[in-house]
Amino acid sequence: MQSEMHPELAKLSFLLGRWEGLGVAGYPDTEEFQFTQVIEFTHDGHPHLNYRSQVWRVNEDGSRGEPVTSESGYWRVRTGKAAQQEDPDQPPIHVEVLISHPEGYSEVYLGTVFAHRVELHTDVVVRTETGLPAAASHRLYGLFGDNRETLGYAWDLAANSKELQPYMSAQLQRVDRKS
């Protein structure tokens, strides 16, 4: 039985479902490559979205190749006074996102939601002793297209002593509206 969506999630409801598509990734000292990706946003009745992403290289024949990475986490909405920042010149913080990576690091993002667009900046990045030395990230997610059925995203990453720069971007089609 499907849980009823928590009312605080209305602002993020446009993300719900399963998204699939193609993207491109590249970083200094790494050859650029195409990938296929699946992202799922689900809910379980609690005041957060469950998030899961899986990425595979694209083979020369266009088929799905070897796994590249995955990540999972939770998207939480801030409401009322909790969304307001101490500095009135700063935009409110609408969402907190926690994402963990098998490369041995986790990120806590703070972000804003406007219409069908989410912009996230890392607040904290922690890693294991042997984890990828990630220092900061910026992500942008948004719907576009005639029926707003395409989820575009861009991920900038600062890692391996490099400054924040483009890392991955993709255009994904909604293939399942299940929430």
From Swiss-Prot:
Disulfide bonds: none annotated. InterPro entries: Calycin (IPR012674), Nb(III)_bact/plant (IPR022939), Nitrobindin (IPR045165), THAP4-like_heme-bd (IPR014878). A motif (GXWXGXG) lies at residues 17-23. Transmembrane segments: none annotated. Pfam families: THAP4_heme-bd (PF08768). Belongs to the nitrobindin family. This is Ferric nitrobindin-like protein.
